[in-house]
């Protein structure tokens, strides 16, 4: 199995508001940057998208270390998801899981890989996280630029 290091981040200007996600994938001496944006979204959706797209980009099963600054993604994947699935994607209080479309997509994406989930404090100077943050903001900027051209 290939060893891949992934850094992800999401950003939102207003919550909800225009948002972006960014991810960096490192494999040996290879590096891939991914980013995207949506005109109306939330920070949590963008954090999820960063992890989803990064994992979906991997063509073969990999040994992954995925670093996020999102407690929402970290707790969801390591603590909450198993019970959500047992309850038919409902919370402990029997409410539908928020962002269930993305959680289900992430659930599918993680199945192929052996993933070590790592949390890092955001905006604390961690180089991988800072780069992912810059890509997330680029995702917002490029999406807004395209919107400006379309109108």
Curated annotation (Swiss-Prot):
It comes from the Bacteria. The keyword Hydrolase applies. Keywords: Cytoplasm, Endonuclease, Hydrolase, Magnesium, Metal-binding, Nuclease. It is found in: Cytoplasm. It catalyses: Endonucleolytic cleavage to 5'-phosphomonoester. Gene3D superfamilies: Ribonuclease H-like superfamily/Ribonuclease H. GO terms for biological process: DNA replication, removal of RNA primer. GO terms for molecular function: magnesium ion binding; nucleic acid binding; RNA-DNA hybrid ribonuclease activity. Its main location: cytoplasm. Its cofactor is Mg(2+). Residues 1-141 form the RNase H type-1 domain. InterPro entries: RNase_H, RNaseH-like_sf, RNaseH_domain, RNaseH_sf, RNaseHI. PANTHER family: RIBONUCLEASE H1 (PTHR10642:SF26). HAMAP family: RNase_H. This is Ribonuclease H. The gene is rnhA.
């Amino acid at each position: 199995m290939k060893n891949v290091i992934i850094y992800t981040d999401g950003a939102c200007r207003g919550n909800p508001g225009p948002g972006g996600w960014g991810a960096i994938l490192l494999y040996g001496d290879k590096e891939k940057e991914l980013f995207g944006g949506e005109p109306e979204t939330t920070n949590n959706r963008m954090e999820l998208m960063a992890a989803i797209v990064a994992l979906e980009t991997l063509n073969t099963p990999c040994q992954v270390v995925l670093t996020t600054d999102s407690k929402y993604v970290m707790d969801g994947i390591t603590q909450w998801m198993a019970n959500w699935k047992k309850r038919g994607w409902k919370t402990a209080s029997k409410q539908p899981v928020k962002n269930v479309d993305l959680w289900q997509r992430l659930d599918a994406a993680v199945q192929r890989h052996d993933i070590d989930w790592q949390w890092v404090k955001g905006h604390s100077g961690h180089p991988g996280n800072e780069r992912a943050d810059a890509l997330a903001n680029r995702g917002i900027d490029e999406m807004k630029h395209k919107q400006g051209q379309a109108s």
